[in-house]
Curated annotation (Swiss-Prot):
Keywords: 4Fe-4S, Iron, Iron-sulfur, Isoprene biosynthesis, Metal-binding, Oxidoreductase. Its EC number is 1.17.7.3. It is an enzyme of class 1 (oxidoreductase). The gene is ispG. This is 4-hydroxy-3-methylbut-2-en-1-yl diphosphate synthase (flavodoxin). InterPro entries: Dihydropteroate_synth-like_sf, IspG_atypical, IspG_bac-typ, NO2/SO3_Rdtase_4Fe4S_sf. It catalyses: (2E)-4-hydroxy-3-methylbut-2-enyl diphosphate + oxidized [flavodoxin] + H2O + 2 H(+) = 2-C-methyl-D-erythritol 2,4-cyclic diphosphate + reduced [flavodoxin]. It comes from Protochlamydia amoebophila (strain UWE25).
Length: 654
């Protein structure tokens, strides 16, 4: 089935055309550059503190700033914040973030440039996650109720020339939407379209959409489904991109880059925010880097091709055959290049992810699965160390024949030998020397015509190593594999050269886009970086793509004026006690608004309920309420233990 259109082109990056939405003096969409946004963490009632944060963000390069508006007092504070900014020479647009309370939106729209509403809770109550049956008639009545409550805001925004963002979050869909569409990207899209139809009915068009989730795969799918719907409807509204509750540090940047960057390479997105559990100005540099990296993709790509197999409506991992003769992990395999001289280094085990004294290593959950040896030789000490690693279960590979490793054969060399009309020249190559070994082929920049050799060679593994246009070339190759019903596993072998920060983002964008589409059985990242960096990045990418969970996954909101405790300090404290629990997902939320709903992907939740009090969740269910802040960390650990997910730190194999 041919893929329904969701972007301008699948073979190259071409920005999706949109109308222009004006937010104060800043235009979004059209031919405007991709805009950078952030959000203050101060109490909105603290006018001076909020002004200072907005100014600091603007000075860092932020173009639009959002503040939380829970009620009328916060709405009134926005008048003074806006005036204070103008008095100090800052015309940066101000956005009010609204949840649950339409009167606050009606008040604050007098003072700000844009209002963000959440269609999941603007009119509907907080989801109870209960089964509720809606027939068509009762469902229609609910839509009428939404229209009655929402239309006054639409009319006022239109009259005052204010902008609006209809911002759906995966975790805060209404009971009504979930009972008809499920807790799915399809529900996210329909939730937003309901509100957009009301805007259009009132001839109001100065709005844009967002589809945020803490899971990058869900987020990517939701945005693609939305653009697919807009192409079908012939709508052209801009999009604000973001992964909500991405967390902090490298993991937060990886999740954000995977979600935001994947869409930017598709040409989707007009404004972005990297939501980090850090001071808000730390979000600006990753945004700037993402935009720069995505811009380099503009008009880059491969020859046009038609996709029949990659479907955005139902994402499934490609079905492959894993040979018992090639070491592979079913949830995603990590290859690492290893210079042969590293075998004598004391830091070897730390670099590849083992533990234990030198000569007696032990595997951990993030130990490299396979090592690709550079310039292997017959040094006895090095061979002894290799045998130790091999006995441990780590696969050894090389690009040249070596007695202890499996050989990776470049398809280019095979084609060159085929071009020479000599039986001897073909079989004097490394292909013959690997007789009896599984066949592992490396594809670089060969053409589709040259790929056909793969059919007759029947490899057990393919290393995919395009040097340019990595994403589009890889998509085209996977489509060709599917068309020819070839179920060979494929490792994404991408080489990078930039700064560490850029490589973290670009590798997450490129590998993440493919992995989130179910394409690729692992990663092999290369470049002028230390092995530890590449290994940790590889495992983090697999985890962010929800393939292989090698460490605790933290879902933490970026904090805002609603937050009831110091989110950064609490997050670090909880991480220090629970970071040894691979596969466990823990959400740390500053308030009830960003609590049970927004942490839809978590196993356990730690949520501020009122000043000095914490609620604990298992999934979406609140199991302990109003715990004293001082006791909450211990109670969280006890809760994890009670559900059989706790491992003592000294015994964990992580």
């Amino acid at each position: 089935m041919v893929q329904k259109k969701y972007c301008e082109a699948i073979h190259q990056t071409e920005r999706r055309p949109t109308r222009i939405v004006n937010v104060g003096n800043v235009g979004i969409g059209g031919n405007h550059p991709i805009r950078i946004q952030s959000m203050t963490t101060s109490s909105t009632r603290d006018v001076e503190a909020t002004i200072e944060q907005v100014i600091r963000l603007a000075d860092q390069g932020c173009e639009i700033v959002r503040v939380t508006v829970q009620g009328i007092k916060e709405a009134d504070a926005c008048e003074h914040i806006k005036k204070g900014l103008i008095k100090r020479g800052y015309q940066i647009p101000l956005v009010a973030d609204i949840h649950f309370y339409p009167p606050a939106a009606m008040r604050v729209v007098d003072f700000v440039d844009k209002v963000r509403i959440n269609p999941g809770n603007f009119v509907d109550k907080r989801a109870s996650f209960k089964q509720i049956v809606y027939d068509d008639e009762s469902y229609a009545r609910e839509i009428e109720r939404i229209e009655e409550k929402f239309t006054p805001l639409v009319e006022k925004c239109k009259r005052l020339n204010r902008a609006m963002r209809i911002g759906t979050n995966h975790g805060s869909l209404s009971d009504r939407i979930m009972n008809r569409y499920g807790d799915t990207p399809f529900g996210m899209v329909e939730s937003a379209l309901e509100f957009a139809r009301i805007c259009r009915k009132n001839d109001y068009h100065n709005f844009l959409f967002s589809m945020k989730a803490s899971n990058p795969q869900v987020m990517i799918q939701a945005y693609r489904l939305l653009t697919q719907a807009m192409y079908a409807l012939e709508w052209d509204y801009p999009l604000h991109l973001g992964v909500t509750e991405a967390g902090e540090g490298e993991d937060g940047r990886i999740k954000s880059a995977m979600g935001i960057g994947s869409l930017l390479i598709d040409g989707i997105g007009d404004t972005i925010r990297v939501s980090l559990t850090e001071d808000p100005w730390h979000e600006i540099n990753p945004c700037q880097r993402l935009i720069k990296l995505a811009s380099a993709y503009q008009q880059q790509g491969v020859a046009p091709f038609i996709e029949n197999y990659r479907q955005i409506e139902a994402i499934e991992r490609r079905q492959v055959h894993l040979s018992s003769t090639v070491p592979m992990h079913r949830d995603g395999t990590v290859f690492i290049s290893l210079p042969i001289n590293m075998l004598k280094e004391a830091s070897l085990y730390q670099q590849i992810g083992c533990e234990g004294p030198f000569g007696k290593p032990k595997l951990k959950t993030a130990t490299a699965d396979n090592l690709v040896l550079k310039n292997p030789n017959s040094d006895s000490e090095e061979k002894r160390q290799l045998q130790i690693l091999k006995d441990l279960g780590i696969g050894l590979f090389s690009k040249d024949p070596f007695e202890m490793s499996l050989v990776i054969h470049p398809l280019k060399k095979w084609l060159q030998s085929r071009a020479v009309d000599s039986f001897a020249s073909r079989f004097s190559s490394s292909w013959a020397k690997s007789a009896g070994q599984p066949l592992i082929i490396q594809i670089t920049d060969e053409t589709e015509k040259e790929w056909k050799e793969v059919i007759s060679l029947k490899p057990q593994l393919i290393i995919l190593s395009p040097s340019t246009n990595r994403l589009h070339y890889s998509r085209q190759f996977f489509e060709w594999l599917q068309q020819n019903q070839l179920n060979y596993p494929v490792i994404l072998n991408f080489t990078y050269q930039g700064e560490n920060e850029d490589t973290i983002l670009l590798a997450s964008m490129e590998c993440g886009s493919l992995l989130c589409d179910g394409l690729g059985e692992g990663v092999w990242l290369e470049g002028p970086y230390d092995i530890l960096f590449l290994r940790q990045l590889s495992f983090s990418i697999l985890q962010a793509a929800r393939l292989r969970m090698s460490k605790t996954d933290f879902i933490s909101c970026p904090s805002c004026g609603r937050t009831l405790f110091n989110l950064q300090d609490v997050t670090k404290r909880i991480q220090s006690r629970t970071s040894h629990l691979p596969g466990v997902k823990i959400a740390i939320m500053g308030c009830i608004v960003n609590g049970p709903g927004e942490m839809a992907d978590a196993d356990f939740g730690y949520v501020g309920s009122k000043p000095g009090k914490i609620d604990l969740y298992v999934g979406k269910e609140c199991v302990e309420k109003d715990i004293d802040f001082a006791d909450a960390d211990d109670r969280l650990v006890n809760l994890i233990r009670a559900h059989g997910r706790w491992i003592e730190p000294q015994t964990v194999n992580a």
